[in-house]
Amino acid sequence: MTGVQTCALPIYQSINVALRKKLGLYTNFRPVRMLPGLKTRYHDLALDLAIFRENTEDLYSGLEHEVVPGVVESLKIITEKASTKIARSAFEWSHRERRKKVVAIHKANIMKLSDGLFLKCCREVASHFPGIAYSELIVDNACMQLVMRPETFDVLLLPNLYGDIISDLAAGLVGGLGIVPGANIGDHHAIFEAVHGTAPDIAGKGLANPTALMQSAVLMLAHIGEREASVRLHNAIYQTYAERDCLTGDVGGMASTNEFTDAVIRHL
């Protein structure tokens, strides 16, 4: 989806923002898991994080203007409706997947009204899930803790801007954006995507890592009820990484995009 168009639109900042708003895709879900055999700074940790990012408002509403020459204003929009929906999405998923902890990440110590409302909604939803431990963490501290002790995190619940930043930080823990999938989910529609950019400088050179796209397909197949196909593709990707003899250059291998893809196909 990121590759369709990268220039700004008249109303929205990007195609991504336009689709999320038009289709009501309020949940951005990004699972962050360590792949077998992949050498990273944290390869000795069995990292398995789930990030739930509100997808439709915050500073991404595109409401900014020049007040006077040299002074601009950008509006941060936080609503009870959107905050409650993303909190419910995170807790319902955590309940289904038997996750133990949800942490809401915020800056309510400074933005007392906007982030304060987000936390109020998170607390209300959390009260309906007594079996899941709920906590809150200021965003700057959360960034430090993710780098120092990433294994202490389970499910992260965030407004749009913090979620955008921290989801990329988390991807760096397990090998980068070429690894991690993404899903944009609403009540009636869903879009699945690799969250990295288009990288036009390497187009056609066989250098791109298709893992994030493949893992996004794993999420999509599970979402539409094709669980067997989802599991087969997931297992094929993991087996390819575990063998380590056909990986792309960004993760320490020598394989081309097509060679890696062929290896995954052989393991299906």
Predicted segments — roles?
Residues A8, R30-V32, A50-E54, I105, ...:
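Short beta-strand segments
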Residues A18-L35, H128-S135, V180-E193, A203:
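Short, acidic/small-residue loops that bind anionic groups at enzyme active sites
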Residues E97-H106, F129-L137, E226-H234, A242-M254:
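Flexible, glycine/charged-enriched surface loops at secondary-structure junctions
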Residues L146-R232, A236-D245:
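Glycine-rich phosphate/nucleotide-binding loop
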Residues Y12-K81:
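Flexible glycine-/small-residue-enriched beta->alpha junction loops
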Residues V68-D140, T152:
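Glycine-rich phosphate/diphosphate-binding loop of Rossmann-like nucleotide-binding domains
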Residues T2-L9:
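Short, small-residue-biased leader/transition segments that mark boundaries at the very start
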